[in-house]
């Protein structure tokens, strides 16, 4: 999903998640996970990252994800504010994948990552396309063309 700022891309995700009520019609989605643009908004500041992952997901398969996303397991023992934005965003993606959702919503998930890590993370996400559907919000049209089956332009 691409479009200018303020076009309603994130609002669409809020509707899908049920955080906003549709004025007409209904939206019904089960087993959905989301990676927000700002990773600090999705982690409680007083609990370690690993505890917040364990609260919502199984840790099965975590080692391979850690390697792909260039994350050290020791980072997961830290509090969110002790990590860089890029590290915490990768932890957010890790948590979402470990939830094994049917639908993964990605709101600018790699905007805080350097180009090399961004490519690694997107390639890793692409490996899981057969396991789940993904909706990606991005301002980067080249990224959308590279990874999407379909592109929806809003605005």
Language-model-detected regions and their locations in the chain:
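A short, proline-enriched helix->beta-strand linker immediately N-terminal to the Walker B motif
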Residues: 98-102
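Catalytic Walker B motif of ABC-type/P-loop ATPase nucleotide-binding domains
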Residues: 104-108
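Conserved ABC ATPase signature
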Residues: 79-83, 87
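Helix-to-loop junction immediately C-terminal to a conserved catalytic motif
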Residues: 17
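Hydrophobic anchor residue at the start of the ABC signature
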Residues: 93, 121
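Q-loop/switch helix immediately C-terminal to the Walker
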Residues: 38, 45-61
């Amino acid at each position: 999903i691409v479009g200018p700022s303020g076009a309603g891309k994130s609002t669409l995700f809020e509707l899908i998640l049920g955080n906003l009520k549709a004025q007409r019609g209904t939206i019904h989605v089960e087993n959905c996970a989301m990676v927000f643009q700002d990773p600090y908004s999705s982690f409680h500041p007083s609990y370690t990252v690993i505890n917040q992952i364990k609260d919502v997901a199984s840790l099965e398969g975590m080692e391979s994800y850690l390697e792909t996303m260039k994350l050290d397991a020791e980072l997961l023992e830290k509090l969110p504010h002790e990590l860089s934005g890029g590290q915490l965003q990768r932890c957010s993606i890790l948590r979402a994948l470990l939830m094994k959702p049917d639908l993964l919503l990605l709101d600018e998930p790699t905007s805080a990552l350097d180009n090399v890590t961004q490519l690694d993370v997107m390639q890793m996400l692409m490996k899981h396309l057969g396991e789940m559907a993904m909706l990606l919000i991005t301002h980067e049209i080249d990224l959308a063309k590279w990874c999407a089956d379909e592109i929806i332009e809003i605005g």
